[in-house]
Amino acid sequence: MPNKGREMLKTDYVFQATEEPRELVRLQMLERIFDAGTQRRMLATGLTTGWHCLEVGAGAGSIVRWLEQRVGPSGKVVALDTNPRFLRGSSSSTIEIMQGDICDMELPLATFDLVHARYVMIHIAEYRKAFERMLRCVKPGGWVVIEEPDFQAARAVTGPEESRLSFGRVTDAIERMFTSLGMDYALGAQLPALFQEYDLSHLTVEHEGHLSAGGGMVAQLMKLSAEQLRDKYVATGKVTEADIEQYCRLADDPDAWAIYYATVAVTGWWQPQCSGPA
């Protein structure tokens, strides 16, 4: 099935220009670390056969393929991504791949039983507009599951002093990189209030600080990100090449512990002016 829509520019995805093989590795690492939690949250909504689901920012496609198995042939999964380069071959009678930006795509209104996005809104300066677009797609009585990072939580706990200082400077560079694009590097912390503001109810809020020793999955994920975004980090003026090297050494050191960031996940029920799910 051909991709639909047109590629938009509202989302300044910081990994857009990275080398395809390394970006696929990074996305697959995200899947290995976080898919189990994402799937648990989705199942808690009552996800079942016949549901129509929208996956915003489909990445390497693991959640899309998992949803296909859950909803079955009577259901529908729409996979939206600004660059669906890693979704080739995922189309089926159940899965529809769309290329575009959630802020501008003309998606069917009040259609989906479940809308999900993971690590998407942090890359969108107009994240409220993106959220509103998602809500417009949800059926009355449908569910929204959003998972976003909070880099404000990051800090080195143990390890050589030089590496810990460099870790702090890299975190400052991450903040500057996002804020220079009009984005919030701690967006995850804003999610619960955002869901309340838009009158979603029956909220479930989870906060997980990713404390990892060097060599752990999260540490290696952030090392790979630092290597891919090295030029962007240095361009902020907050770090040097040497700082990034020290950060990567700490991420490899099994005796060095750090909170690399936190993830906030919020699930909410969308039914304006109604008391709650049956």
Residue ranges, per PLM feature:
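Conserved Class I S-adenosyl-L-methionine
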Residues: D184-A186, S201-A278
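Conserved catalytic/acceptor-binding region of the Class I
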Residues: V145-G216, D231
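Conserved alpha-helix/loop element of class I SAM-dependent methyltransferases that forms part
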Residues: R32-H52, W66
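Class I SAM-dependent methyltransferase SAM/SAH-binding core
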Residues: L54-M105
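Class I SAM-dependent methyltransferase Rossmann-like catalytic core
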Residues: K10-D35
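A short SAM/SAH-binding and catalytic strip from SAM-dependent methyltransferases
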Residues: D113-R128
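A short acidic, Gly/Pro-enriched loop at the edge of an enzyme's catalytic core
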Residues: M105-L114
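A short glycine-rich, Lys/Arg-flanked "PGG" loop and its adjoining helix->strand segment in the class I
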Residues: R128-W143
